[in-house]
């Protein structure tokens, strides 16, 4: 009888866990739908800014102030800025592992070359993984809010702009997961600085923008950095929720299989007990 009690307790426990994983799956699915809508709206903005930046730079008809020139600087004696985007929570398969693995590999490569390194880490999981081995390289750490927040994007942008303005870094690379679908996310390493500058006479007429302000280039740089950070944050958030939704769906299905096996085992145990009792009753009646 004690065995039956243990089985019933285990079934109850697994059912309780199944309810939790199912709820987490539904929450992630809801968040993913919302983020995918945000990505759809932001993609046009990112493409437009990138095209405008490319056109203006290749036309080469606007003045480049000293501050703006720092974003095109390819000096190698400055630090490499690595922006690492992870998550606040786990339960999302290899989402964080792949990013952290790539970042560690690149840090070791840069160290072997004697290059300077600065880290900006977004997400608790990334900070926990990188704090102990690379604490001296960490410049900033940002916690992820529960929902996509433009304030975080602005804080990261301001930090990047300050580091470049102070001539502390010469290039900037963002590490994030690019969203393909709920089942598939790809670890992405995207360099956003220095900005490539080249000349193309065919772009001169196309680049004649009517602009009122001190400097078109500097404002375009601000918009460009903003758009790249926002794009990476949205892609990473969608990848996180997609990965967690898939993980929780698998967990829910696994719980269902375990429950079925436990119920079958419970029924067989009960049947064995009943059979044993019947045998004892029959044997007792024959003895009488």
Curated annotation (Swiss-Prot):
GO biological process, one term: proton motive force-driven plasma membrane ATP synthesis
Role played: Produces ATP from ADP in the presence of a proton gradient across the membrane. The gamma chain is believed to be important in regulating ATPase activity and the flow of protons through the CF(0) complex.
A GO-annotated cellular component: proton-transporting ATP synthase complex
Protein name as annotated: ATP synthase gamma chain
Location of this chain's protein in the cell: Cell inner membrane
Family stated for the protein in its record: Belongs to the ATPase gamma chain family.
One Pfam family, short name: ATP-synt
Record keywords: ATP synthesis, Cell inner membrane, Cell membrane, CF(1), Hydrogen ion transport, Ion transport, Membrane, Transport
Keyword Nuclease: no
Main location: membrane
The keyword Protein transport belongs to this UniProt entry's keyword annotation: no
Its membrane topology: Peripheral membrane protein
GO MF terms held by the record: ATP binding; proton-transporting ATP synthase activity, rotational mechanism
Assembly behavior: F-type ATPases have 2 components, CF(1) - the catalytic core - and CF(0) - the membrane proton channel. CF(1) has five subunits: alpha(3), beta(3), gamma(1), delta(1), epsilon(1). CF(0) has three main subunits: a, b and c.
InterPro entries per the UniProt record, alphabetical: ATP_synth_F1_ATPase_gsu, ATP_synth_F1_gsu
């Amino acid at each position: 009888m004690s065995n039956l009690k243990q089985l019933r307790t285990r079934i109850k426990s697994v059912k309780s866990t199944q309810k939790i994983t199912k709820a987490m799956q539904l929450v992630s699915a809801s968040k993913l739908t919302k983020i995918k809508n945000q990505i759809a709206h932001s993609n046009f903005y990112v493409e437009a800014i990138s095209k405008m930046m490319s056109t203006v730079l290749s036309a080469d008809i606007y003045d480049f102030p000293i501050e703006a020139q720092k974003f095109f600087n390819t000096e190698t004696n400055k630090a490499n800025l690595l922006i690492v985007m992870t998550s606040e929570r786990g339960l999302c398969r290899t989402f964080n592992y792949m990013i952290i693995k790539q970042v560690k590999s690149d840090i070791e490569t840069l160290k072997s070359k004697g290059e300077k390194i600065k880290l900006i880490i977004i997400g608790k999981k990334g900070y926990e993984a990188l704090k102990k081995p690379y604490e001296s390289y960490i410049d900033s750490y940002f916690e992820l809010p529960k929902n996509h927040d433009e304030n975080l994007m602005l804080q990261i942008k301001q930090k990047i702009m300050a580091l470049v303005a102070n001539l502390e870094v010469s290039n900037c690379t963002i590490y994030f997961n690019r969203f393909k679908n709920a089942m598939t996310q790809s670890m992405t390493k995207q360099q956003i600085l220095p900005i490539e500058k080249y000349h193309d006479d065919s772009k001169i007429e196309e680049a004649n923008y009517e602009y009122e302000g001190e400097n078109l280039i500097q404002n375009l740089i601000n918009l460009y950095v903003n758009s790249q950070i926002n794009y990476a944050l949205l892609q990473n958030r969608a990848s996180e929720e997609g990965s967690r939704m898939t993980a929780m769906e698998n967990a829910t299905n696994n719980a269902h299989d375990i429950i079925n096996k436990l119920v079958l085992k419970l029924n067989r145990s009960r049947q064995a007990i009943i059979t044993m009792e019947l045998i004892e009753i029959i044997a007792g009646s024959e003895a009488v």
